[in-house]
Curated annotation (Swiss-Prot):
UniProt cofactor note: Binds 1 heme group covalently.
Gene from which the chain derives: petA-A
The protein's name in its UniProt record: Cytochrome f
Quaternary structure, from the entry: The 4 large subunits of the cytochrome b6-f complex are cytochrome b6, subunit IV (17 kDa polypeptide, petD), cytochrome f and the Rieske protein, while the 4 small subunits are PetG, PetL, PetM and PetN. The complex functions as a dimer.
Family classification: Belongs to the cytochrome f family.
Annotated positions binding heme: Y36, C56, C59, H60
Topological type in the membrane: Single-pass membrane protein
Protein species of origin: Pelargonium hortorum
């Protein structure tokens, strides 16, 4: 009887452990797959502040380049590509959340003019579909279809991201006009240094929170350190927790100042933003321009023909 109860208890514990592991796996996977966009989406109504700064820069502190390429002009109700390039050295590795080294991911936010939006699948050409692949584009908000986000996605494969964009038609959307519009882009590579709640990730420098002497350094079993700093003037002790990943720069017995770096800076990524301009062109204006150019060309041809005819008449009169 006792053996049966023991087996039943073991079975329950195993089932509970498996369920807990599955839940943690799902939560962790969701957190990793949505990390870049979801932080901004949850914390900010608009990813671009009034100053022009894109909010991703609040968490990704290093400044890195980003580039965007769009056509100079587009016609209404047409699909075009907005190509975002996020360059970085493919050989470098970043510090992951567990302290190990891994490849960099990239992410981007594309802020289009009102009326522009992600092109529906049935409007995208086969060539463009092949270039885009299976990238999971999404709107920043269900009501903000002109703001698109992507990431994190593997940087080695997607350091260049092509957004398929559908231009609006002023005939059906009265809020849109044939004008020149700005487009804003932000792109990051690698993990951030600050979480939305203000806490630091393990992808940045850890600084001393107090001045004093390093009295003890304990290396934690799962990585990272506990550094005890003793203030000689009052005997107070402060323990700074160093997450796994960064390289320790201090040793026991060393004198520290407040905010002195305790670790190296492991960050190899960063964020950048840029802009471009695009003209929504009126087809009638294009037709008018073509008609004008054709008229000028025909006038020039007739002028040349008339001149040659006049020269022939002059030549015949001289011969006569």
């Amino acid at each position: 009887m006792q053996t049966r109860k023991t087996l039943s208890w073991i079975k329950e514990e195993i089932t509970r452990s498996i369920s807990l592991s599955l839940m943690l796996s799902i939560i962790t996977h969701a957190s990793l797959s949505n990390a870049y966009p979801i932080f901004a989406q949850q914390g900010y109504e608009n990813p671009r502040e009034a100053t022009g700064r894109i909010v991703c820069a609040n968490c990704h502190l290093a400044n890195k380049p980003v580039d965007i390429e769009v056509p100079q002009t587009v016609l209404p109700d047409t699909v075009f590509e907005a190509v975002v390039r996020i360059p970085y050295d493919m050989q470098i590795k970043q510090v992951l959340a567990n302290g190990k080294k891994g490849a960099l991911n990239v992410g981007a936010v594309l802020i289009l003019p009102e009326g522009f939006e992600l092109a529906p699948p049935d409007r995208i050409s086969p060539e463009m579909k092949e270039k885009i692949g299976n990238l999971p584009f999404q709107s920043y908000r269900p009501t903000q279809k002109n703001i698109l986000v992507i990431g994190p996605v593997p940087g080695q494969k997607y350091s260049e991201i092509a957004f398929p964009i559908l231009s609006p038609n002023p005939e059906t959307n009265k809020d849109v006009h044939f004008l020149k519009y700005p487009i804003y882009v932000g792109g990051n590579r690698g993990r951030g240094q600050i979480y939305p709640d203000g806490s630091k990730s393990n992808n940045t420098v850890s600084n001393a929170t107090a001045a004093g002497i390093v009295s003890k350094i304990i290396r934690k079993e799962r990585g990272g350190y506990e550094i005890t700093i003793a203030d000689a003037s009052n005997g107070r002790q402060v323990v700074d927790i160093i997450p796994p990943g960064p390289e320790l720069l201090v040793s026991e017995g060393e004198s520290l100042k407040v905010d002195q770096p305790l670790t190296s800076n492991p960050n190899v990524g960063g964020f950048g933003q840029g802009d471009a301009e695009i003209v929504l062109q009126d087809p009638l204006r294009v037709q008018g321009l073509l008609f004008f150019l054709t008229s000028v060309l025909l006038a020039q041809i007739f002028l040349v023909l008339k001149k040659k005819q006049f020269e022939k008449v002059q030549l015949s009169e001289m011969n006569f």
